[in-house]
């Protein structure tokens, strides 16, 4: 089981400092969509150039022109790129093919997908490396959790790995770990903690059953 740190509300220099502080406890560092919007793909390059031992994910949330956008993210050092599950099948397939051509991976974000089981099966067939159930920020504010969505997706796929994101914190991660996803994505639960290193350490300990 992998652990990903999602960083959204810092600049690229701050994100790189935070990532290096916690890199011993995580597998993947995400340059979140707000950073990409504010600073562009050079933020991905900056992190990639200044960290070792972890993969770098560019959270582009691609919707169209998928092969081009994946190729650009890869050019700037991304190991994993995200596309939206509500994108057209042709876009998903183009993104998968482009990522795999470069030996990289594609994560499909299921935010706003209505029929989770059907779409997850489609994405599994299209070759997605990860399918991520994602309770977005706006729904977290309404008290929603990704647990039920995680169970639904896990029940129907056979090839893709399952990722889960949305409001996960050190004190709630054990409920997620119990569902045995392949990748757990934690954002503010680490990044906004009083002691991010301790928070990351606690998340890793929960994953390892300690």
From Swiss-Prot:
Q: What class of enzyme is it?
A: lyase
Q: Which Pfam families match?
A: OMPdecase
Name its pathway.
Answer: One-carbon metabolism; formaldehyde assimilation via RuMP pathway; D-fructose 6-phosphate from D-ribulose 5-phosphate and formaldehyde: step 1/2
Catalysis: reaction(s): D-ribulose 5-phosphate + formaldehyde = D-arabino-hex-3-ulose 6-phosphate
Q: Which family does it belong to?
A: Belongs to the HPS/KGPDC family. HPS subfamily.
Functional summary from the UniProt entry: Catalyzes the condensation of ribulose 5-phosphate with formaldehyde to form 3-hexulose 6-phosphate.
What's the name of the protein? Answer: 3-hexulose-6-phosphate synthase 1
Tell me the lineage of the source organism.
Bacteria, Bacillati, Bacillota, Bacilli, Bacillales
């Amino acid at each position: 089981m992998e652990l990903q740190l999602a960083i959204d509300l810092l600049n690229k220099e701050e994100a790189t400092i935070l990532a290096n502080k916690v890199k011993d406890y995580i597998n993947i560092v995400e340059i979140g969509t707000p950073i990409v919007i504010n600073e562009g793909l050079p933020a991905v390059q900056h992190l990639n150039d200044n960290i070792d031992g972890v993969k770098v994910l560019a959270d582009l949330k691609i919707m169209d022109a998928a092969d081009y956008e994946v190729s650009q993210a890869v050019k700037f050092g991304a190991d994993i790129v995200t596309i939206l599950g509500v994108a057209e099948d042709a876009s998903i397939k183009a993104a998968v093919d482009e990522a795999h051509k470069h030996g990289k991976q594609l994560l499909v974000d299921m935010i706003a997908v209505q029929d989770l089981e059907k779409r997850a099966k489609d994405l599994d067939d299209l070759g997605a490396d990860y399918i991520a159930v994602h309770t977005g920020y706006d729904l977290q504010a309404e008290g929603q959790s990704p647990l039920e969505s995680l169970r639904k997706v896990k029940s129907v796929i056979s090839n893709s790995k399952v990722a889960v994101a949305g409001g996960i914190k050190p004190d709630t991660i054990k409920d997620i770990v119990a569902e045995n996803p392949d990748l757990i994505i934690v954002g503010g639960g680490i990044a906004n903690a009083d002691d991010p290193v301790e928070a990351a350490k606690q998340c890793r300990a929960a994953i390892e059953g300690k």
